[in-house]
Structure formats: C-alpha cells, structure tokens
Amino acid sequence: MPIRPANLAARIRPLTALARRNRPADGTPGDPAAAAPEEVAPQEVAPEAAHEEVPEAAYEDAGQEEARHEDVSPEDPRSPYERLGGERSAREEELLGTLPGVVRHREHLAEERRTLLPADRRDGNLAEVSEALRAAGLPHGIVPDRHPRHRLAIRPGDRPAVLEALAAAFAGQAVYADLLEHGRTLTTVLAEQLPGAVALLEYEAPDAPEDSQEGSPEDSHHDEQDGGHDGGHDEEHDAGQDGRPDQRDTTPPEQAGPVWPADRVKGVRIYRPAVIGTLLYGPETGCDLEFWDSAAPSEGAIASIDETPFGWWVPSLEANATTTIGGRPYPLLDVFAASLPEQVDFPIDAVITWVDDSDPAWQERRAAARARLAHTAAPIAEEDGVAESGIAGDADQRFRNRDELRYCLRALAANAPWIRRIHLVTDDQTPHWLDTAHPGLTVVPHRELFAGTDAGPVFNSHAIETRLHLVPDLAEHFLYLNDDVFLGRPLVPEDFFLGNGMPRYFPDNRIIPPGGAESGDSVYVAAQKNTRGALAAAVGKTYPRTLKHSPHPLRRSVLAESAERFAAELHDTVRSPFRSAADLAPVTLAIHYGHATARTVEGHLYDGYFVTDSTEDLARLAQLHDERWADYFCLADGTRDLLSPEEQEQAVTDFLRAYFPAPSPFELRGTAREAADEASDQG
C-alpha cells in the first residue's frame, strides 16, 4: 500500500528525533525498539545474553594477566558467545555512568558528536591503535587495501602481546573489538576484554601453538574468488564470504559438561563508536589488526584474513617504509612501498552545477530569456513537464532548489575526502551558508565559462556542460555531478578511475530507441539520439544505452577534445538558453567518445534512483537510510505532480538531514539554517 505524505513524514521525521529519544539525561538506555538500526554489516554471531547475572569473568580488568584456559568452567551451560555477551553487557552498564559524553546507541556505547566525518573517525581509530602498539614496542605495518578501512599486519607470535597492549590502552573506555576469523566476525567485545575473550573462544585447544598453521589460509585461499571492491562495497568482509579454512579437530577427551566448537581468532577490528543524529560510526570505521601466520619452513608470512595486492604470502613483514594517512606517518610494509598499478596517485577534483530558483535576480534573467524565445517555442513532450512559458526544457522542476547542495557537499566530505578541490558552477549565485573562502572550494560563474562567445544567459545544463573543460584550475581527472546526486557511503578513487588514469563510466539499462530524433520525442530522448548520431558518424560506433544519473568520472583533456572535434554539432547547443530537441548531451558525448577511442572503461557501482513525487520511491528512502546499500543515489524531480512541492520538500529534507547529519567543512558555522537545524535536533 503506498505511503501517503503524512505517514511518510512519520516514518522519516523520527530519524532526526532519535538522538533525543536515545539519549536521556540520566544516561540510561533509550528504547531500542524506537531506534534506527545501526549501520553495520550482518555478522555470524551467536545470540548474546543481555543484562543477566554473570559468573566471575576469566579476567577482572584490562591489563591484568591473560585469562588461562583452566579458568574456563566446562560446567557453565552457556556457549562462549553467550557468556561474552553477558559480560560485555554488564561492563557496559558500569561504564555508561562514568564516561562523559557517551550514550547507548542500540547495541553500543558511543560518543555523541555533531561534526565528526567518517574519514576522521577511521583515521582516529588507526592513530589510537598504532600508538598503543608503538608504546608497547610491537612492530606493525599498513597493508594497502581497496576498502576505506585501515589494515595492520601483526607478526607471527605477537598476538598475545598485542591483545594485552590493546586491553591496557583502552581500559575503561567505550572502545570495541570485533573478533575476526577468516571470512566472518565471531563476536564483539569491549577492547579491554580482549585477552580473556580470545582465551574463552579458544579454550578447547589449550595446546594449540599460538600461530598454528593448521587452518591457515595458505591452502584454502588459492581457490577462492576475489570478492574485490570493484563490484561495489563488500560492506563488511565478514558478511557472506565462502572459503572458511578447515578447523583442526580439537575435541578434548572425556571432558565433562558442554563442549563448544573452538574458533580461532585471526584478527581484531578496533573502533570507538560515535553517533551523530541517527548515524552510527561503528565497525566500518574500525582499524583491522591481522595476526599473520608464519610460512615456516619457508620464509615470510601468510595473511590471516584478507588477500593483499601480492596475494596471501609476502616474503617479509618488515615495515621500514612509511605512508601518510590523515596527516600522520605510519609504518608501511616494505613489500608495498612501491606504487602499484591499480593505485590512483593523481589529484581528483569535483565539479557541481547548481541553481537557486528562488533568487529574484535569477528569476528576472530567466523571464527575459523566456520573452525572447516565446515566439519560437518548441512543442513539449509530456515527460518533460509543461512550462508556463511554453518553452521546452523550461519546466520549474528543472531548477527547483531544496537545499540539496548542502547535502551533496556533506556527502562528498563524508564519503570522498580524497577530493582535492570542489568547483561550484553557478549563475552568479552563492548560498548564504557556503564558506566561499574555504581553500578546497571555488565558485565559478557561468559568465566566466561563456566569455568570448555570443551566448547570452543560459538555463540549459547541456550548454553549461559544453564549457566544463574551461573551469579554471580544474584537475585533469574530476567527477562531474549535479546537486541531486549524492555519494551514499565511503568510496575510494579506484571506484572511479583506473590507476593509469582511465575513467570508469556507468551505463544505464535504459535503451534509447533506434533512429534519429522525431517530433514526438521528449527533449531528453531527442538529445540522446542527436548525440548518438553525431558519434556514430564520427567513429562508426552506435551506443544504444544512456548513462546513469551518477557522478561522472571525466578527463579534462578528453572533454576538451570532444568539444573541439564536435564543435559544429555542438554549436547550437552552446547558444541554446533552454534545453531543446536540437541539443546534444555533451557529457554523454564525451564519455562515449572516450570509450570509442579506448580512453574510458565501463565500471560498476551500486546506485539508487528515487523520484521525489512518487510515494513508493519516498517510502524506499527509509530503507536506504537504514541499510545504506547505495554507493550513490539520485533524488530526481518528478513531473507527475503526485505530491505537492511542499510535501516533496518536507520528505526530502527530513531524509537528507537524517542521512547526512554531519556538517561539511564548506558550511559557515553559526548560519541561520545551522541554528535552525540544531534547534530542530534538540526539539
């Protein structure tokens, strides 16, 4: 049954109010049933016992001697997972009243923050872990990975000392540790519980050597298919992988009481949870410590959990090289010191086009352009929307501003912190909340791009796209996106470019009908047909599919070459103030031209497309918020008027505030809108 606007608001608005319900002043837990699900990957974990009476733990405090296997009572009827869950819950209750600024958010204790970005939390977790290891004199080294999360390799034999060091460093703090086996997460404990927790899970094998090669990935990993980051995120590598290594038979003889299967802990993921609004930074921001296995009698070591760029085996874990992450140097395994071919090491910019339809000066310019063209208005296809002016491509929804730019910038700051500079292309407009002095942001007016042409003011995205290669100081590699396209979760440069600089492009499943533009075609379809025909005439390739509404990875040089080669075909598009059936689509042209000339390759990311006047699509936004399954998504204006503009704006604003609660560094602090947001959050 479609969700009507009132019900939709009731579903989305509680997302922004959860902080209030989940954070009572006395620090007691909020109502879990009312909280939004955490943004963590599914885990293969046995049920945990919550808030129950627990026996004396195998350890009393972090930093004490590691629990011994003989301390584990075989008569306890609960599984190790149930015992650890009960012990963790009891300890969380003790900590909750003693840690300022820490609240319970669903299943974690978390710092309550307002401005923290995911990359800052990832880098912060890495810094804390590396410092704890350095202080304990424990060698470690960064392992490059396509996932944004950081990985550290730990030498064979160092696991007990590492567990003790982490427990001591994070004693009495709301810092968590996921216990990792190859291909799955075993369970989650407080970091201060690590030595005893690992001992409890492995108590059936008291005689197993600390770095036993039985069950190592050396034999089992070679036949596994590389899951890779290329097909979109494996949101957590512990969910849904096959190829778990064989486990040795460690059943103790004649043991009384229940016998639980022993699990081998091959790594730990350390993270300090933080919550902003309803957004939890949890294990996806953690730092992975992998307890590598010895390759004896051969030299080197074998990765315990995930493959490396060189496979599972490396000749040495020496880490004399360094790499800089978040402005800090870290030891890097020597074997990875050389630049790898898949690594992107060139700067990447972003270009965003934006318009504010509420600006009176812009409205006057648009009205004047309408008046000049009114007597030559082209017929309008239904799916383009009907403009009051009667001019094709001039429907109001094409220029509607719902403050999407604010959240588009938040998405880039949160999920693509590697962007060097953002270029905002506007028609002499700047939102009041934008920090135009920020060194990572440049505002580019249309008149600067169209200088030297006879084109007047333009309200045509196609015309603007013909001039993007002229943006001053634009990097050779950049992402082009409209302000209604949002990065949905952390991505890496390799999601958009190959290491050799070649952009990836994202074709849609939609097919443009064969043939040239016809009178009944929409402006969009006509422009796509015109583009396809011009390209086919030049390179002999016909592209049936259009492109997704995505961030478009582009090379400035290819865009400029395309503009020059197709200058005659683009002549009228450059000078068309509104979208018309005679236009070409310049970005589509450049991308397909790059592909036809072997300078662009097809890529894949998980995407979402939502039409804001569709009740069904708006209802799906709640699921997107909860699960965060999209690498990017588009909130497109509809033309069917199923919901009023006011209803659409309310639903979209509620969703975007909940999905991107952390301000970007491009927002002025203390603006009226920010104050309104804070007042709304505090209710």
Predicted features along the sequence, with ranges:
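N-terminal anchoring/stem segment of glycosyltransferases
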Residues: 80-150, 156-158, 317-448, 598, ...
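PAPS-dependent sulfotransferase catalytic core
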Residues: 161-170, 608-664
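Noncatalytic N-terminal accessory/assembly modules of large enzymes
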Residues: 2-30, 71-209, 246-269
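Long, charge-rich alpha-helical interaction segments
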Residues: 497, 503-577, 581
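GT-A fold catalytic core of metal-dependent nucleotide-sugar glycosyltransferases
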Residues: 214, 430, 467-512
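P-loop NTPase catalytic cores that bind/hydrolyze ATP
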Residues: 568-600
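Active-site-proximal specificity loops/subdomain of glycosyltransferases
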Residues: 433-474
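Intrinsically disordered, low-complexity repeat/linker tracts enriched for polar/charged residues
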Residues: 37-38, 42-43, 47-51, 55, ...
